[in-house]
Amino acid sequence: MAVTFYSGFKDKFHALDFLTDNVFTGFQIKNKICIALKGDHELEEFSFLRNKKFFETKKIEFLCLKNLTTITDKFEGEFDEIHIFSDKISDLPGSLNDNTFVYTLKSDEAINNASRELYTNLKNKGVNVLHEVI
């Protein structure tokens, strides 16, 4: 099991844009996807980006909500992929797979602090933590 942390985004828009592209890849292989977002504002921005990408690419997958779950605080259920851009997720359930991604942002101190705590908790559990600077 491994969790990938992405960092180095210029702002929230770029982080959500990258997240949206990653989610679209999951839709192509019909994964059940969970997205943990900081709050309603980020959910609105994610929805805006999904629609924008649909109009730019004409790929219907961006409009598919059937296999997409969004949360703001805790995980319930099993997922093929988990994407986290939240300040409320500091630990993860034990039944994770290699398709867990965490997006961090220096300009959002709450998300950055929660990501650091999550990183520490995962390392203490012996989870393989990967880091990629974007």
Feature annotation, model-predicted:
Residues 3, 32-34, 81:
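Residue-level preference for the first positions of well-ordered beta-strands
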Residues 1-15:
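Glycine-rich phosphate-binding "P-loop"
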Residues 56-73, 129-134:
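A generic structural motif
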Residues 16-63:
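Short, well-structured hydrophobic secondary-structure segments
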Residues 8, 36-40, 84-88, 105-107:
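Structural motif
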Residues 45-46, 74-75, 115-116, 120:
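Active-site acidic carboxylates
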Residues 63-102:
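Mid-chain, well-packed structural core segment of small domains
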Residues 99-134:
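Glycine-rich, aromatic-bearing surface loops/beta-hairpins
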